[in-house]
Every structure is written in structure tokens, then in C-alpha cells.
Amino acid sequence: IAIFEKDGSLRKNNASSVVRGAGAEASVMSVKADEHGLYAASYSRLGTFEGVMRLNWVTGDIDYMADCHGDSYDVLPAGDVVYAASHSHDCSNIGGFPDVSYHYHNAVAYTNAATGTVEDNHGAGYKNYAGQNATTNLNFYPDFTPGKISGAIQATWTVEGNDKYVVYGGEFLAVNGTAQQGLVRFARRDIAPNKQGPMDKGGAFKVSGSSPRAGVVSLSFKANWDRDDKTLTYNVYRDAMNGQPVTSQTATAGFWERPDLSATDVVEPGSTHRYRVQVTDQWGASTVSDWVTVKAAEGQGLSKYGARVLADGAAHYWSFDETSGDKAEDFVAQRNLTIRGKAYKRGAGSVLGSGASLGLTSDSANKSHAATRVASQAPTAFSMEAWVRTTSTSGGEIMGYGSSAANQSWSRDR
């Protein structure tokens, strides 16, 4: 790539010292420009650079790169977004989707700015651009059915647009499951119909229910996904959908990183209820699961305090109400604790006046503690409530995040 001065002389350009897009099986396929810089779309069969990058007009440096494996054929800068015609199959180097059996994405979008740095290369046979400025792979994943006229099994070849629409051209037969041949137009968000909702629809969105203890119903479901919205809202309804949901939560995830979600409801022990989960994007497009019927276990129900904790929307709740064993159940997210050490006691009365308690010791020879089996990312801020009775006057940590579940954590948050 070369940038020329007005008099025809060559302007200093540092891009070629980083990216080499030339040779028998590598090329810069398209170059576009705007006031921010010069944009290039590249392919390579020699393991150099595939993806999109932006060069700075003044310095000749690479402002950012979208190090996404898979040929890129054309690029369109459109304000704060850059669109590419490609068959991208691995954007994990910039925090995007990973390579899954070479599933091609023929239209992708990126933030038109540097948002971080490229990670160490995740794919064999490609050059490592770790540390270079990177952009972000946006949640824009239309699905194309490729044609066969060229034999390249490539759906999109070009992308153009204006301040209202983005247009892809190529040899495709359908888009998002609807017949659409060779040319397709996508509207910008503010004028788009915004009818593409969560993709696992109706009965395909699976919800399971159980009752782990008296009067408590636990629902489990995997996060849904959406072609153009990464954040979805999950409302859980009991018996009917004409009132307020039992619980509501949001989850932000790409199609490749869908977490397991859960919800908890407190009802009369022995009662039977139907539950349904509605998933909605920020534009109102939604789907609902089938109803799932759950009978709450019989017996002594959750205490008034525990019911209030759940009603307040706690992310986790361990009551330590079990009278035996080495487990402490999480009533909200099923992140159960394992009690470690020998010097612990169960079944004594609780300081809350009802239920049982867990007795631990910090004695150096007989330490005991409780921890989750699976690690999770510590949040930057959170609140907690714990009821404790102690005879110690030396103080110490009651609850927090640490680097070890089995032993003393050398890295912890408090």
C-alpha cells in the first residue's frame, strides 16, 4: 500500500513493515478512504494478514487491524462502523468468534477505532500480530447461502453504502433463510425494521426446571443469541404472562460464548406451577419458550429471611441450612460450595433464629472454609451480606474471591 503526496512523491508509510500483503498467494483486494484514513481488505494463503486494517493519513502507521482469519474482499467505512465482505471464520485474535469447523461469516462489521490490542495468534499457520492496535468485532452476523457460479463457495464479493443503507453484492441465493439473490440491502439501525429477534425460537429455546428443596423452584436455560444484538433480556413468568415476571435478568454474549443461566422462584411447598421464559432484544423483538411444569418439593419451606433475599434479586444465596454433608447449596445460580477441612460443624442453630448454621474454624492446625468448585471472574464491585458469630478478636476475611478453592489463596480481593 502506498500513499502519495500531491506532487506525486511517496509519503512515508510504515504499514509494509508490519503487514506484507503481496506475493503469489496474498493480496490487498480492496482499498477505500475517508477523512479518518485509508482502509484495506486482504487475503493470504501464505499465513500473513487476512482481515481489514486502517492506515493513518498523516503518520502512515496502522491505526488498527481486524486480525480475522478468512479472506476479506471488500471494505466499507461508514462513520463509526466498518463493514467487510469476507468469509471470516476466526476473529478470536481480537476477542471475536473462534474458528468452529470453518463456518464462514460473509458479512462482518467492526468498530471504526482502535479499542485494544491483538492477542497472541490462536490459529496455526498465521503470522502473530500480538500487540498491534486492534478493533472490535461487532455483533452483526447475517447468514448467506453461497452460490456456485464461480466455484469459490463465496457469497459476498463487494460492499457499498451511504448514510442509510449498506449493500452487499455477490453470488448468494438467500440471506437469513429468505430467498435473495446476488444483491441485498441492510438498513442502518435508526431506520431498520429491527425484527431480527433471538434465534432459538419457541420450543427450540429449552428451559428445564427442578425443585432442589421444599418450596424452591430452580429453572435452567442457556443464553439465547441474536444476529444483531448482543444483550438480551430474560423474563421468567409463572402460570400466566399477564402480570409482572417472577424474575428478570440481562445477559451479554456472542453466539459462541452463550453462558448457562438460571432463575429461582419461592412458592408453597408441594404446589405445582408452569414456567415460561421470554427473551427480548432492546428493540422489542422476542421469543418465548414452551411452558415447563415443576412441582415444588414438600417439607419445611424457605425461611422468611431467605425468601426476602431471593425477592431482593441476590445473585447468589447460600443459607448453610443443611444439617450434614460437605455441600452448601446456592439457591440462585447453583454455584454450590464445597466445605473443606475437618474442623467444621453443621446443624447448630442459626443467629437468625431459625434454620441451621455452619461452624468453621480459623485455627492454624484445623482450618476449614467453603468455596465454589469452578472459578469465576471477580466483579469490580459487589455487595454482600453475611451473618456471623465469632469469639475471635483478631478480625479477618469473612467472604471474598481468591485464587485457590482448596487451600489458602495467595491472590485475593481483600
Predicted regions and their residues:
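Parallel beta-helix/beta-solenoid repeats that form elongated, surface-exposed shafts/blades used
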Residues: 163, 301-307, 410-413
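Structural recognition of the beta-strand scaffold that forms the well-ordered cores
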Residues: 83, 316-319, 400
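Extracellular glycan-recognition modules
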Residues: 324, 328, 365-414
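Residues within well-ordered beta-strands of beta-sheet-rich folds
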Residues: 220, 274-278, 317-321, 381-389
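Extracytoplasmic surface signature
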Residues: 1-301, 312
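Extracellular acidic, Ser/Thr/Pro-rich low-complexity tracts
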Residues: 223-229, 281, 324-331, 390-392
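Extracytoplasmic low-complexity segments
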Residues: 296-364
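Extracellular/periplasmic catalytic domains that process cell-envelope and extracellular macromolecules
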Residues: 32, 76, 308-313, 350-352, ...
